[in-house]
């Protein structure tokens, strides 16, 4: 398995991502939610760190992303930003913080930027959130869009199945993708859509298109850290590649520690003052 060390250690910006697309360099993106893990992810050379509303699932144990609040997202965002020197930090606007009206959306985005010091925000949707996008961008806040499977709309769709397989939905996705670029979004996430459609979107847009379950024809890839490191169990979508099995490693370490405490093997004389 190959490893990577970035040659350019300068801070990644939204403009750098667009430059990376123009020269054909793929963009690496991963979630992080706390200081310690964000520091490791950043030092590894990740281009983008997403403080995702998936924290609702992997950090809080919720079934969906819907329960997480703006205050909670800001807490996680603050923790991550403190650790990061190079990567671009993106914070998700959670469900209910921008769908109501554009004023509410702007207030939410401003809070995220002021309180976390993140580089930009991400939100889900196309035409239906046009006014919110325009209002946020007018305040000088960069936006990463998100189309395809949109977890905040799980109650509307009912499943986490692949989206945009039918012609009508695929056409709407194409229209929304172009709209997001025209409005001024600097990048777009496509989740769980046919690879051929995702490749077409990436080829038609000048902004970076980052996929999760969208094939290899896009400009970059994003995964949830807990999934790719093998911390979460019982979740194996087709698009997920596990690069470690930390759940087993952690289990072994914990049981070893418990055994050493019970047997009085820990602490030994060298581990005392």
Curated annotation (Swiss-Prot):
Q: Which GO terms describe its biological process?
A: pantothenate biosynthetic process
| Names of required cofactors | Mg(2+)
| CDD domains attached to this UniProt entry | KPHMT-like (cd06557)
Q: Copy the pathway line from the protein's UniProt record.
A: Cofactor biosynthesis; (R)-pantothenate biosynthesis; (R)-pantoate from 3-methyl-2-oxobutanoate: step 1/2
Catalytic activity reported: 3-methyl-2-oxobutanoate + (6R)-5,10-methylene-5,6,7,8-tetrahydrofolate + H2O = 2-dehydropantoate + (6S)-5,6,7,8-tetrahydrofolate
Q: Enumerate the InterPro entries for this protein.
A: Pantoate_hydroxy_MeTrfase, Pyrv/PenolPyrv_kinase-like_dom, Pyrv_kinase-like_dom_sf
Functional description taken from the UniProt entry: Catalyzes the reversible reaction in which hydroxymethyl group from 5,10-methylenetetrahydrofolate is transferred onto alpha-ketoisovalerate to form ketopantoate.
| Protein name as catalogued | 3-methyl-2-oxobutanoate hydroxymethyltransferase
Q: What is the lineage of its organism?
A: Bacteria, Pseudomonadati, Bacteroidota, Bacteroidia, Bacteroidales
């Amino acid at each position: 398995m190959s490893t990577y060390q970035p040659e350019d250690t300068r801070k990644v910006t939204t403009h750098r991502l667009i430059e990376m697309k123009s020269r054909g360099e793929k963009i690496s993106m991963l979630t992080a939610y706390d200081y310690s893990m964000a520091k490791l992810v950043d030092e590894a050379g990740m281009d983008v760190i997403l403080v995702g509303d998936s924290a609702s699932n992997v950090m809080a144990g919720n079934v969906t992303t819907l329960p997480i609040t703006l205050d909670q997202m800001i807490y996680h965002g603050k923790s991550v930003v403190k650790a990061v020197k190079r990567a671009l930090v993106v914070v998700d606007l959670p469900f209910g913080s921008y769908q109501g009206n554009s004023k509410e959306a702007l207030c939410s985005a401003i809070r995220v930027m002021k309180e976390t010091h993140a580089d930009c925000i991400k939100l889900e949707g196309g035409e239906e959130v046009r006014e919110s996008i325009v209002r946020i961008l007018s305040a000088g806040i960069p936006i990463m869009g998100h189309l395809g499977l949109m977890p905040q709309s799980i109650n509307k769709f009912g499943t986490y199945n692949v989206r945009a397989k039918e012609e009508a939905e695929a056409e709407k996705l194409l229209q929304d993708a172009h709209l997001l670029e025209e409005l001024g979004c600097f990048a777009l996430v496509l989740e769980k859509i046919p690879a051929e459609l995702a490749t077409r979107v990436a080829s038609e847009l000048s902004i970076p298109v980052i996929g999760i379950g969208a094939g290899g024809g896009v400009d970059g890839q994003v995964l949830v850290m807990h999934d790719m490191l093998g911390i979460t169990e019982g979740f194996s979508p087709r698009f997920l590649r596990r690069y470690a099995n930390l759940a087993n490693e952690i289990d072994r370490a914990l049981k070893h520690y418990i055994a050493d405490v019970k047997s009085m093997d820990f602490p030994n004389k060298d581990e005392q003052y």
